[in-house]
Amino acid sequence: MTTTKTAVLSEAQDTQTETNREIAIDFLTRAARGEARDAMRRYAAPDFVHHNPWFAPDAASLATAMDANARENPQKELHVQRTIAEGPLVVVHASVRHQAGDRPAAVVHIFRFEDGRICELWDVGQEEPADSPNTAGMF
């Protein structure tokens, strides 16, 4: 009996983890298109906190900044390269170009979920150097 309950819990956790992965990708896709406010309404928990050092930690401040960036960069492209999801955490490694012809930046977003909502978000990014000795690249 314990095995059956464990299997059912594991399947439910796997389903929620996959849902979290899909939400994280949709959140970033919407934000890149200038729909960060909508993404926050859809997916952020009421007590959402982000850890980007350039903005206040609340959802509204981050959404304002993300939407402003999308307006300033209407040709912005976000391409998800890979994701890692385990339990309440989802990591998205993406390439981002703000303008056509720009070098891509490697950006990693780390999401923490509670009850199917994004409750915490971290992000780090680095522009791909034009002259790098690493022939494997950043992606």
Tell me the role of every PLM-derived stretch.
Residues 1-139:
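C-terminal and inter-domain tail/linker signature
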